[in-house]
Structures are given as structure tokens and as C-alpha cells.
């Protein structure tokens, strides 16, 4: 969950969190536009967050995560509450991000994992029970 300032616009919210994470102004300007497009909020960039639906706020949270261009991104149940179109868009974003970043995706939605993961790790009661390459059986 991300704390939002309801009177900030989507763009201002992302800029603010990027600033807090130490992103320099030049990089922030280009990254904000890109992440807004990536999460399909570009058309809503000047709308106040208080007018956003739950799914839009969730996508805004994803944009906030991505704006600082981290090497590792951890998503916990990121597609819950997204409609099918936005779920597909998010999976495409994960595929794009995973080319240059390590993505850890925690989910109960098997189709999310099957479509975007290279490896599956199952943890039960804090213990690793499975580590497997998707499409193969070569445990590493």
C-alpha cells in the first residue's frame, strides 16, 4: 500500500516520491512521463488522486515504484483489483522491466506467474518448498 496525497495530481505524486528517493530532476522529468504511459495513466496525469478508482491508485503505486529505476522490484499481489485489460497491460510491463531488472512477484494468481516468470519459487510456512525454472525441471 502506498500513502497518497489526495489533492496531488498523479504527475505530482510520482514526482514527489521520485524526489524522496533521490532521483535527480533531469532523470525524474523523463521517467515520470514514461511510467505514466507504462501504467496507462498518462491521460490522467493532471487529475487529482482523490478522483482515482482503486485500480488507478494501484497503477499509480506501480508507477511510483518504477520512477526511481530500481534494480530490483518486489510486487505483492500487483494485479488484484485490476480489470482484465489492465492486468494484461501490467504483464506486458513486467516483461519489459524484467529485461533489465530483477522482478520478484508474490501472487496467488497462477496465470500471472506462468505468463511472466522465468522461475517459480514456492514458500510454505517460511520454508522454501520448490525452486523451478518455468517450462523445465532444472533446479538450481
Language model features with spans:
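Catalytic Walker B motif of ABC-type/P-loop ATPase nucleotide-binding domains
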Residues: 73-76, 82
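Helical segment within the ABC ATPase nucleotide-binding domain
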Residues: 87-99
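A short, surface-exposed alpha-helical micro-motif characterized by mixed small hydrophobic
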Residues: 113-115
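Conserved ABC ATPase "signature" region
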Residues: 15, 19, 26-44
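Hydrophobic anchor residue at the start of the ABC signature
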Residues: 62
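Conserved ABC ATPase signature
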Residues: 48-52
